[in-house]
Amino acid sequence: MSDTPRAPAPIPLASKPRPVASGRPGSGKTACIRTFGCQMNVHDSDRMRRMILDAGYAEVNTYEDADVVILNTCYVRENAVDRVRGHLGELNRLKREGRVKKVALTGCIGAAKESNTLRSRFGIDLVLGTHNTYELAEFVGLPTMEETYTPDLRGTEGEHAAFVTIMTGCNYRCSYCIVPTVRGRMVCRSKESVISEVDRLISSGTKYVTLLGQTVDAWRYEGDRFCDLLEAVADRAPRVSFTTSHPSNMEDRTLRAIGEKDTVVKRLHLPVQSGSDRMLRVMHRGYKAERYRRKIGVFREAAPDGTLSTDIIVGHPGETQEDHEATLRLVEDCAFDSAYVFKFSPRAGTEAAALGEVVTPGLAQRRFVEILRAVEGNAFARNRRKIGGTEDVYVRHGANDEGRAIGETWSGHAVHLRTDAAPGEYVRVGIESAGPHVLYAGNTPEVESEAKLG
């Protein structure tokens, strides 16, 4: 087995099958949803899930058992598109055999020109982009075709947790990124609308709210800024986090709120992409490395125990060894707890795809490994400090067949623990060991009530 380290993915490329949900009894109709890509897509899939349930479909986990299959897709990197092509090939075969009746392609691929080719090649019945998913209502037989159709949402991890989208799109034009093309320019929801949704979710039992946006900290509405919204949500919700942020929008007040607000998870995901000022200019990121370092200093002061993660691209066209070494220095200076390290993937329609000075695959791989090893070294050292301590852990995913659950500390650390506690409960555990990406608890945690922990 190779000892080459691998970068952890932010979420699985294709979603894991969810527990089967039921539509109206007696309909006999079945549907399967597969989600590729970011948390925004996970949230969009929840909206579509409510549509199919409202239309009387029962959700199933396999294509073979489904009358209708919906692929909610990602277009950020070519390997994501390759995976979708593979799924479409399988679905095309099942349609020819009469085992699947209809296939819908939604999400970012649906908003790209390539969707026309995929539609004709694989016999896709419906293609939707990121701004017209409401049209799925008619596709599944709902008696409404109104753009305002907004199904009642449930938490995306069950009743205990929910994503709340506060804005869509992006106004930045990073050299490598296709998101503004397929998601459009930034559109922000009103503060009143967001708060109303949060209040409704909490009243229905949601305990953990995650605010979502392509550049979530860019949210602005009628004089309010993201820090105003975050503080308002934190005053209502028992537990709050947010993703994903852009350094150019990140205000000191927001960083301090992470540390000061008891209900905000002390975690910051702030993509830097490169530690080289020259490459940051080429990428059109809008900040310098020193400005990024200063923001991290504010965060570390506000939340000394908090977790910090980032995104880094290696092998962007024109990246030199000097640029790479500047990124390594920034990694050491910031001591990230984790990083999503990506080798540059050219996307048609982006500025970077047309640039020369291509970094060879072999060199990009070496730089990838060096960055990842530096990140993991820092992360492992920071996690080891937790060994022997006690943590209050929020259970995110209940125990598997082996009795092991996955939870999260208030500092944002992932924890593996043995417990019968249900998702949404808190458990007090001792940390016995650690890896670079996870803490491991003892075998006899004590379930604590939320009131007692508060």
Predicted segments — roles?
Residues 120-124, 236, 410:
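Short, structured coil segments at secondary-structure junctions
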Residues 156-160, 170-172, 264, 274, ...:
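Short flexible coil/turn linkers enriched for glycine and charged/polar residues
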Residues 101-105, 112-114, 203-322, 332:
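Conserved SAM/AdoMet-binding glycine-rich loop
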